[in-house]
């Protein structure tokens, strides 16, 4: 899961891209990068770490240009390392840079095809580099000295035919401008906004979430539709066209559960309101299963579950309290690359307030239970703080299946609910009672925000994958490639480390 930004402005855009990336930091903490274009030359700065650590004032001063793209990365395809920081770049044709959020499920096939048929070299194991080279090759086939918007749209139409999976991308083409596109299923989010400069010039931004627009005063004007492509020329003219044959709006439901910020709008759905509805639906299930629940207090696991927890407590008519204090300098445990890092992080990240636990029946609320690492330790912390009984509620259904569209849930045997009943999960995490949201209720909570959606990508809950190329062989291959043990081994060997091949300048 990653954060994307693309901008075309009246003046240098690097500072606004930086600000937007800080608003998307929750989507990826492994690496960050910005690439801009000025007078036909591309400039870049990228590296491992948080946005604030990768960029310094001397770097920003070198990132000149009125259009550019930015990326905050969390690795889902390929290992971690400086060589995989985005954007990626190819010099032919034109000079193209691209940043990508999602996962190509036919990446291995495309890699072979690019080498054997398209005569293109790939330097990493990242599917983002694959996507860039497919796009570049399709533009090159058109043979234009400089592409027109209709050429961009033609190339992206073929990209949609060749590439399978869930993806949103922003790209810049030297001497042309900004390009953004989204997969035909609309799995990964991408929004577009505009801002009127003091001179009257209209400036444009595309981003993974609407909060990235807010920080620089951009007005949300809508979403990049499934299968759609947007071009903004260097002169600031916006073009958009549907490039897929049969697009359907089926966004990833886990964005609403966990990844997106609550103050974001995506696909016309308020994440905040959706999580409020999740809490209300969960309260109804609690009352169905335990009318005499005896709950004294509802306590959220910071931060994602706070909104659902407030709604849940209100509907139950019990107190809502902040029973855990969060260390703001520890990253999100779900998106930490290794299991050992996640385990170590929980107690560093959260500390209980004993007053809220002593001699009480406590209902802890979290957005979901993935590996069970966090909730098991938190339940133990609640008991140590004096809780009489510890109940646990998940605002999402049991996560039983791997995600193949850009969220790091790679290995089924690492998912605590895979192959287990709810009762078995309860015993494993040590709760006195465990309640999950029903899938039908979860989907209804999001659909209420936009009845026009065709459905939701919910494969982590039901095992039904939108793209037809997902079989047991594929799932086993990604389990082997992306399991925590394999990822640690690959990083230790430096599989994806080494020199970053790309642009080299003072940034």
Identify the meaning behind each predicted range:
Residues 1-226, 231-296, 301, 389:
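Conserved short alpha-helical segments that host acidic/polar catalytic motifs at enzyme active sites
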Residues 134-150, 302, 310-332:
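Amphipathic alpha-helical
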